[in-house]
Amino acid sequence: MKPDSIILDIDGTLWNSTPVVADAWNLAVAENSSLPVRFAAYDLTQLFGRPLNAIADLVFPSLEEKERYALIDACCEQEHAFLSASTQELLYPGVADTIRKLSKSCPLFIVSNCQSGYIELFLEKTGLSDCITDFECPGGTGLGKGPNIRLVMERNHLHAPVYVGDIEGDRMASAEAGIPFCHAAYGFGSVEKPDYVIREFSELLTLFSC
């Protein structure tokens, strides 16, 4: 079935914010704990895409649950400040131009496993707010990516969307939502048997014409 819309992931699909976020998290950990934990950008590529509490469980296992979740919240707060102030080009090549072109004929949405405010920050930083019809995240609903995809579908009366993401968890969320998955192979992870593959974001223009 021809797609009637495209739902997008952010990290590893639209941009790579890991160099900036690593610096932010390192400062937050140093200021809010005595843990000897330091993050490199690559470390975050292996963590992004998971729910934040799951990331906290992985990287701060020595802390009590309440403390580790408070620390990941501090990391996210510092991350927001660092990203807001950053002048680095974080978008993958061709993303802004492709989104602007696609949005003229195809409704575009974002569903990401992120904290509240992250998608809004992304849209503000990139100037793409007017191209995105709707978005959702666990920070807004408390739901996982699959249910959030379904929520966006129901809210916007979508019948045949495709989800574009970069890791196996994105494929699994698409399957949970009952929609096809397109793997952004330039991103952070490998995927088992995606329905579609793009090696540059601009390939969406020829792959899908809603």
Feature map (PLM): residue ranges:
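Short beta->alpha linker loops
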Residues: 20, 47, 90-94, 114-115, ...
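Short, acidic loop-to-helix structural element flanking the phosphoryl-transfer center
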Residues: 81-110, 146
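Structured helix-beta-strand junction loops
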Residues: 50, 104-105, 159
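N-terminal helical cap/lid subdomain that shapes the substrate entry/recognition surface
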Residues: 3-93
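Asp-based, Mg2+/Mn2+-dependent phosphohydrolase catalytic module
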Residues: 1-4, 116, 120-210
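Conserved phosphate-coupling serine/threonine residues in phosphotransfer and NTP-handling enzymes
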Residues: 13, 112-114
